[in-house]
Amino acid sequence: MLMNLKLFHMALIALLIQASPVWAVEAGKPLPDLGLAEVQKTKGQYIYIDFWASWCGPCRQSFPWMNALQAKLGPKGLKVVAVNVDAKRADADKFLSHTPAQFTIAYDPQGESAKKLAIKTMPTSMLVSPEGRVLFVHSGFRAEETLQLEARISAAMGN
């Protein structure tokens, strides 16, 4: 019995370590080349990059906020780019038919960009400076945090 409990605790710890968000990119460091034309096109601008998947409930909740964020801060120099990592484009298209995006969508069906950043949680987002430096990384989406997140983005942009 004690041995089973010990094995359970070891398995739980291993699971928690694996599930914890670990980013290959950190605030203040350059964003690596993600191999996405939609991100490359935004060089020289502030970019809010969001990684999402069609099966992710919090991702669905974040889209109206990102639409509003693009509308509000786009004229001040922010470009929102949401990177879909679904293996099937049809899954992303179905999601977008119910939850439209008024910002740029990039498709990465192999998930290579998320792998480069060691992203483990959906959604995960980051703000990147015009110089290509990651300003911060944010994991998950909670509606009650949107005002703080928007304030953080605005402050980083000097607005």
Give the location of each predicted region.
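Thiol-/selenol-based redox modules, centered on thioredoxin-like
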Residues: L127-N159
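A short beta-strand-turn-helix
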Residues: A27-I47
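Thiol-based oxidoreductase modules, predominantly thioredoxin-like and allied folds used
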Residues: G77-A90, A101-Q110
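Short, internal strand/loop/helix patches
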Residues: L96-E131
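Short pre-active-site segment immediately N-terminal to redox-active cysteine/selenocysteine motifs
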Residues: Q45-I47, F51-W55, T121
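Conserved redox-active cysteine motifs that mediate thiol-disulfide chemistry
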Residues: F51-A68
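Sec/Tat signal peptide C-region and signal peptidase I cleavage site
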Residues: S20-A24
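Bacterial N-terminal signal peptides
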Residues: M10-A19
